[in-house]
Amino acid sequence: MAVERTLSIIKPDAVAKNVIGEIYSRFEKAGLRIVAAKMAQLSREQAEGFYAVHRERPFFNDLVSFMISGPVMIQVLEGENAIAKNRELMGATNPRDAAPGTIRADFAVSIDENAVHGSDGPETAAQEIAYFFESDELCPRTR
Protein backbone atom coordinates (compact mmCIF):
# COMPACT_ATOMS: atom_id res chain seq x y z
CA MET A 1 0.00 0.00 0.00
CA ALA A 2 1.18 3.48 -0.83
CA VAL A 3 1.67 6.31 1.62
CA GLU A 4 -0.19 9.27 0.16
CA ARG A 5 -0.95 12.85 1.02
CA THR A 6 -4.31 14.50 0.51
CA LEU A 7 -5.76 17.93 1.12
CA SER A 8 -8.65 18.28 3.53
CA ILE A 9 -10.67 21.40 4.25
CA ILE A 10 -13.05 21.74 7.16
CA LYS A 11 -15.57 24.16 5.69
CA PRO A 12 -17.14 27.24 7.36
CA ASP A 13 -20.26 25.40 8.53
CA ALA A 14 -18.28 22.79 10.47
CA VAL A 15 -15.83 25.38 11.83
CA ALA A 16 -18.83 27.40 13.10
CA LYS A 17 -20.16 24.27 14.84
CA ASN A 18 -16.83 23.98 16.69
CA VAL A 19 -16.24 20.37 15.58
CA ILE A 20 -12.66 20.74 14.28
CA GLY A 21 -11.29 18.59 17.10
CA GLU A 22 -13.89 15.88 16.56
CA ILE A 23 -13.03 15.73 12.85
CA TYR A 24 -9.28 15.68 13.59
CA SER A 25 -9.88 12.80 15.99
CA ARG A 26 -11.56 10.83 13.21
CA PHE A 27 -8.58 11.42 10.91
CA GLU A 28 -6.16 10.21 13.56
CA LYS A 29 -8.24 7.18 14.58
CA ALA A 30 -8.25 6.14 10.90
CA GLY A 31 -4.45 6.22 10.84
CA LEU A 32 -4.07 9.55 9.03
CA ARG A 33 -1.38 11.95 10.23
CA ILE A 34 -1.78 15.72 9.99
CA VAL A 35 1.45 16.99 8.43
CA ALA A 36 0.36 20.60 7.88
CA ALA A 37 -2.57 22.70 9.07
CA LYS A 38 -3.77 26.27 9.17
CA MET A 39 -6.92 28.24 9.76
CA ALA A 40 -7.70 30.79 7.08
CA GLN A 41 -10.37 33.22 6.00
CA LEU A 42 -10.36 32.67 2.25
CA SER A 43 -10.63 35.66 -0.05
CA ARG A 44 -13.03 35.52 -2.97
CA GLU A 45 -10.01 35.24 -5.29
CA GLN A 46 -8.57 32.29 -3.33
CA ALA A 47 -11.90 30.43 -3.34
CA GLU A 48 -12.48 31.12 -7.04
CA GLY A 49 -8.98 29.91 -7.86
CA PHE A 50 -9.27 26.78 -5.76
CA TYR A 51 -12.63 25.82 -7.26
CA ALA A 52 -11.80 27.04 -10.80
CA VAL A 53 -12.57 23.57 -12.17
CA HIS A 54 -16.22 24.27 -11.30
CA ARG A 55 -16.30 27.81 -12.77
CA GLU A 56 -18.88 26.94 -15.46
CA ARG A 57 -21.12 24.92 -13.13
CA PRO A 58 -24.38 26.53 -11.93
CA PHE A 59 -23.40 26.19 -8.25
CA PHE A 60 -20.01 27.93 -8.60
CA ASN A 61 -20.99 31.37 -7.23
CA ASP A 62 -22.88 29.88 -4.28
CA LEU A 63 -19.93 27.59 -3.51
CA VAL A 64 -17.48 30.50 -3.53
CA SER A 65 -19.79 32.64 -1.37
CA PHE A 66 -20.13 29.78 1.12
CA MET A 67 -16.39 29.14 1.27
CA ILE A 68 -15.69 32.80 2.12
CA SER A 69 -18.56 33.05 4.64
CA GLY A 70 -16.28 32.18 7.57
CA PRO A 71 -12.92 30.67 8.43
CA VAL A 72 -11.86 27.24 7.22
CA MET A 73 -9.32 24.73 8.54
CA ILE A 74 -7.00 23.48 5.83
CA GLN A 75 -4.85 20.44 6.47
CA VAL A 76 -2.66 17.94 4.69
CA LEU A 77 -3.26 14.35 5.72
CA GLU A 78 -0.71 11.59 5.21
CA GLY A 79 -1.04 7.84 5.47
CA GLU A 80 -1.64 4.56 3.68
CA ASN A 81 -4.21 5.21 0.95
CA ALA A 82 -4.90 8.63 2.49
CA ILE A 83 -7.06 9.85 -0.39
CA ALA A 84 -9.54 6.95 -0.31
CA LYS A 85 -9.46 6.76 3.48
CA ASN A 86 -10.33 10.46 3.82
CA ARG A 87 -13.11 10.19 1.24
CA GLU A 88 -14.56 7.23 3.14
CA LEU A 89 -14.44 9.22 6.40
CA MET A 90 -16.16 12.19 4.72
CA GLY A 91 -19.07 10.23 3.26
CA ALA A 92 -21.20 11.10 0.23
CA THR A 93 -21.25 14.72 -0.96
CA ASN A 94 -24.94 14.95 -0.07
CA PRO A 95 -25.21 14.28 3.67
CA ARG A 96 -28.62 12.62 3.12
CA ASP A 97 -26.80 9.94 1.12
CA ALA A 98 -23.85 9.69 3.52
CA ALA A 99 -23.42 6.53 5.56
CA PRO A 100 -24.10 6.82 9.29
CA GLY A 101 -20.99 7.72 11.25
CA THR A 102 -19.34 9.64 8.41
CA ILE A 103 -18.33 13.27 8.87
CA ARG A 104 -21.02 14.55 6.52
CA ALA A 105 -23.75 12.38 8.03
CA ASP A 106 -22.86 13.69 11.49
CA PHE A 107 -22.01 17.35 10.84
CA ALA A 108 -23.38 18.52 7.45
CA VAL A 109 -26.85 19.87 6.82
CA SER A 110 -27.06 20.03 3.02
CA ILE A 111 -25.23 19.32 -0.20
CA ASP A 112 -24.17 22.99 -0.17
CA GLU A 113 -23.03 23.13 3.46
CA ASN A 114 -21.41 19.71 3.59
CA ALA A 115 -18.73 20.24 6.25
CA VAL A 116 -15.58 19.03 4.47
CA HIS A 117 -13.62 18.90 1.22
CA GLY A 118 -11.17 16.18 0.27
CA SER A 119 -8.99 15.64 -2.78
CA ASP A 120 -10.42 13.09 -5.22
CA GLY A 121 -7.20 11.66 -6.65
CA PRO A 122 -3.39 11.82 -6.53
CA GLU A 123 -3.05 14.54 -9.18
CA THR A 124 -5.67 16.82 -7.65
CA ALA A 125 -4.23 16.16 -4.19
CA ALA A 126 -0.81 17.39 -5.33
CA GLN A 127 -2.33 20.47 -6.99
CA GLU A 128 -4.57 21.29 -4.03
CA ILE A 129 -1.78 20.86 -1.47
CA ALA A 130 0.47 23.17 -3.51
CA TYR A 131 -2.36 25.72 -3.75
CA PHE A 132 -2.38 26.25 0.02
CA PHE A 133 1.03 25.09 1.29
CA GLU A 134 4.68 25.61 0.40
CA SER A 135 6.73 22.41 0.50
CA ASP A 136 8.64 23.62 3.58
CA GLU A 137 5.35 23.87 5.50
CA LEU A 138 4.81 20.09 5.29
CA CYS A 139 6.24 18.35 8.34
CA PRO A 140 6.99 14.64 7.87
CA ARG A 141 5.77 12.58 10.81
CA THR A 142 8.56 10.07 11.31
CA ARG A 143 8.06 9.35 15.01
From Swiss-Prot:
Name the chemical reaction catalysed here: a 2'-deoxyribonucleoside 5'-diphosphate + ATP = a 2'-deoxyribonucleoside 5'-triphosphate + ADP; a ribonucleoside 5'-diphosphate + ATP = a ribonucleoside 5'-triphosphate + ADP
Q: State the GO CC annotations.
A: cytoplasm
The record places the active site at H117 (pros-phosphohistidine intermediate)
Task: Provide the cofactor list for this protein.
Answer: Mg(2+)
A GO molecular-function descriptor: ATP binding
UniProt: ATP binding residues = K11, F59, R87, T93, R104, N114
Q: Which InterPro entries match?
A: NDK-like_dom, NDK-like_dom_sf, Nucleoside_diP_kinase, Nucleoside_diP_kinase_AS
| A single GO BP | GTP biosynthetic process
Q: Is Magnesium set as a keyword in this record? A: yes
EC top class, as a word? transferase
Keywords from the UniProt entry = ATP-binding, Cytoplasm, Kinase, Magnesium, Metal-binding, Nucleotide metabolism, Nucleotide-binding, Phosphoprotein, Transferase
The answer to whether UniProt assigns keyword Plastid to this entry is no
Chief place of localization: cytoplasm
* Listed Pfam families: NDK (PF00334)
- Entry's localization field: Cytoplasm
Report the EC number(s), separated by commas if there are several: 2.7.4.6
Q: Which PANTHER family match?
A: NUCLEOSIDE DIPHOSPHATE KINASE
Extract the HAMAP family matched here.
NDP_kinase
| Described purpose of this protein according to its UniProt entry | Major role in the synthesis of nucleoside triphosphates other than ATP. The ATP gamma phosphate is transferred to the NDP beta phosphate via a ping-pong mechanism, using a phosphorylated active-site intermediate.
Binding partners and assembly: Homotetramer.
The family annotation for this protein states: Belongs to the NDK family.
What is the protein name stated in its UniProt record? Nucleoside diphosphate kinase
